[in-house]
Amino acid sequence: MALPILLDCDPGHDDAIAIVLALASPELDVKAITSSAGNQTPEKTLRNVLRMLTLLNRTDIPVAGGAVKPLMRELIIADNVHGESGLDGPALPEPTFAPQNCTAVELMAKTLRESAEPVTIVSTGPQTNVALLLNSHPELHSKIARIVIMGGAMGLGNWTPAAEFNIYVDPEAAEIVFQSGIPVVMAGLDVTHKAQIHVEDTERFRAIGNPVSTIVAELLDFFLEYHKDEKWGFVGAPLHDPCTIAWLLKPELFTTVERWVGVETQGKYTQGMTVVDYYYLTGNKPNATVIVDVDRQGFVDLLADRLKFYA
């Protein structure tokens, strides 16, 4: 039986590819998709969800737009990474359908209530919508199997020296998620910076030759350009968000540890830092499965295999 998931995302090139991977995988049943503000403004990320589902001919999936700003802060966006539209590069179709006439939290709650079994929430943007859901619907916590997030890092940040972008945008929301008591899986920069797509991988995807694989290759063409900056020291571009979906599909490709994680919300230099108690120094009981490594070639092979679904 397919695993029911609810995807909360802020497309974003890597979010878009996470959507592609999830919808090409019969092991997963995508119940709904909600949009968060982060990689671009809330209007643009919602539009990008609709554009991707139009491309994939999955306009049957309910979509709703989320919070327009973080819980306690002004919104920061990553337009320097993802471009003016949030999905610069390929020519994507205009949406052929509209979002639901409700908020992201309302759609999430409805999805959880109506599901016969607990739902896995996959969140690949800031955690604002998920935190709002947890705070406003404590009666539905038991309907959440786990929360798989792309965010954080045990080590170096990518937005500040200490903080990864998704957590930095709304650290208060991320702290609510980590301390919720619901199982959390964290795909942070420790693993996603190892899940790099090289130029030759992009050409492999392009050679598959269907419209979706071509779009994915064109998304990666744009994404690779940003990551050529020598400061990163990358061979390719880290494909952050699809790591969440890939872990659900093939956990054997990944190495994980069970640790306690907290989020710094006030530090002068460390706002948005995920503090991972790797050496069990706090005495706190582990609250997260932290993904720390990936079989890069296996990850690329999985993407290539699933892109053939769209032939």
From Swiss-Prot:
It holds the Pfam family IU_nuc_hydro. SUPFAM superfamilies: Nucleoside hydrolase (SSF53590). Its EC number is 3.2.-.-. Keywords: Glycosidase, Hydrolase. The active site is at H240. GO terms for molecular function: purine nucleosidase activity; uridine nucleosidase activity. It comes from the Bacteria. One of its GO terms (cellular component) is cytosol. CDD domains: nuc_hydro_IU_UC_XIUA. One of its GO terms (biological process) is nucleobase-containing small molecule interconversion. Hydrolyzes cytidine or uridine to ribose and cytosine or uracil, respectively. NCBIfam families: PRK10443.1 (NF007761). Belongs to the IUNH family. RihA subfamily. This is Pyrimidine-specific ribonucleoside hydrolase RihA. It comes from Shigella flexneri. The lineage of its organism: Bacteria, Pseudomonadati, Pseudomonadota, Gammaproteobacteria, Enterobacterales.
